[in-house]
């Protein structure tokens, strides 16, 4: 979510879509290939694309149904929102770029990270929301005044953030305690002590518990999953450098000393890294690793398998040099954008804005974000998750979410 712009990833997505754009033009030269929303009588149909995930589709479909039933109009015409999942292959970014090129892009979609938004903004494909009163109102309602600054692109705002997943360490609590530690390490010295003790007890206590490896990270040996360095490299890199970026615009500005320190931290695992694929390591009766990168979207799965936060696993902050240093971390965070395209009428754009305004206005935003949290177990981008009473019950029920929320300000 922070300053890093995924230049290489976006370039790759663009290259992949280039070969398919030719065969996806408008049928007959005048009409879009897909059935694009538009004004019909006194109804304006607005297309909304969700992430290619069923749980997110279900959430937005329920919001669209409620909005449609409310009978909201613009200039006397009723707005109806139609929801569908965006294309997933070869990537959602490629699907959006193809839709832009072929005039089949929706009026609005979710699932846009800041890096891809920068690419879209540079090509004039999305609206700048900075001067919109409704956008400012939403930021205020969600207490996002500090967070939104990290989403700025050349001083402008093109994305309404929806959710944030801080990527931090997820520790095997039972294994930690067996090694003699009551909490997750915070500093390099504490981290080193834990890994050193693991190595000393690997063939004894750990073997008896079924903990065979220190770190689960199969993507480390897979060149085709290079993007996972955002998680296993950037998280320690940001924490150890005080939040320094490693890409600014199209320029690599990697801090050499910080990069070496991040690799040295990962190197402490030595030959005890589990690089083989395991479908869901944390749902095993006895997880076979000491630590992984967390996966917030799996919280419900853990609960279904009777895993208890604080007993079976615990989140640990990004590792810092010294006690008291800010634990900056990478975050998987995405939001909404409104598309500019000749196939999208002014009425459709206005209708899309009305829908998003209704979902996130002062009266609805807290309930919307609570519904999102309950549906996805992914943290909504808000500045009051641990303070707003409406979230108190779910945070009490899900202490793991409350723990993740503490990492949001540093993402």
Show the residue positions of the predicted features:
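Short, low-complexity disordered leader/linker segments with a strong preference
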Residues: 1-46
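Long, aromatic- and glycine/proline-rich binding clefts that accommodate carbohydrate-like moieties
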Residues: 146, 150, 316-318, 370-411
């Amino acid at each position: 979510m922070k300053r890093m712009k995924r230049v290489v990833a976006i370039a790759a997505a663009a290259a992949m879509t280039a070969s398919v754009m030719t065969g996806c033009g408008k049928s007959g030269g005048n009409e879009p290939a897909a059935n694009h929303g538009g004004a019909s009588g006194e109804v304006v149909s607005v297309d909304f694309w969700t992430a290619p995930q069923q749980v997110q589709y279900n959430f937005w479909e329920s919001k669209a149904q409620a909005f449609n039933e409310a009978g909201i109009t613009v200039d006397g015409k009723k707005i109806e929102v139609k929801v569908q999942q965006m294309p997933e292959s070869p990537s959602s970014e490629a699907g959006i770029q193809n839709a832009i090129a072929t005039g089949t892009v929706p009026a609005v979609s979710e699932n846009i990270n800041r890096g891809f938004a920068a690419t879209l903004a540079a090509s004039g494909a999305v609206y700048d929301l900075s001067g919109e009163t409704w956008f400012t109102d939403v930021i205020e309602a969600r207490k996002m005044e500090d967070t939104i600054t990290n989403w700025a692109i050349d001083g402008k705002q093109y994305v309404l953030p929806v959710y944030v997943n801080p990527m931090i360490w997820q520790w095997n609590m039972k294994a930690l305690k067996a090694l003699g530690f009551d909490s997750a390490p915070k500093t390099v010295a504490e981290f080193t002590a834990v890994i050193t003790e693991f190595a000393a007890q690997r063939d004894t206590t750990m073997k008896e518990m079924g903990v065979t490896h220190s770190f689960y990270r199969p993507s480390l040996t897979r060149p085709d999953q290079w993007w996972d360095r955002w998680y296993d490299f950037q998280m320690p890199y940001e924490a150890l450098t005080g939040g320094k970026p490693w890409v600014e615009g199209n320029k690599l500005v990697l801090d050499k000393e910080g990069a070496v320190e991040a690799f040295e931290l990962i190197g402490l695992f030595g030959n005890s890294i589990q690089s083989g694929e395991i479908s869901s390591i944390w749902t095993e009766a006895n997880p076979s690793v000491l630590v992984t990168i967390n996966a917030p979207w799996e919280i419900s799965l853990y609960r279904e398998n009777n895993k208890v936060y604080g007993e079976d696993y615990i989140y640990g902050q990004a590792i810092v040099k010294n006690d008291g240093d800010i634990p900056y971390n990478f975050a998987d965070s995405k939001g909404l954008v409104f598309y500019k395209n000749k196939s999208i009428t002014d009425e459709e754009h206005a209708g899309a804005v009305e829908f998003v305004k209704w979902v996130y206005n002062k009266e609805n935003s807290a309930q919307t974000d609570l519904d999102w949290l309950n549906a996805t177990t992914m943290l909504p981008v808000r500045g009051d998750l641990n303070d707003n009473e409406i979230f108190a019950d779910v945070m009490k029920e899900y202490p793991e979410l409350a723990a993740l929320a503490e990492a949001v300000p540093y993402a």
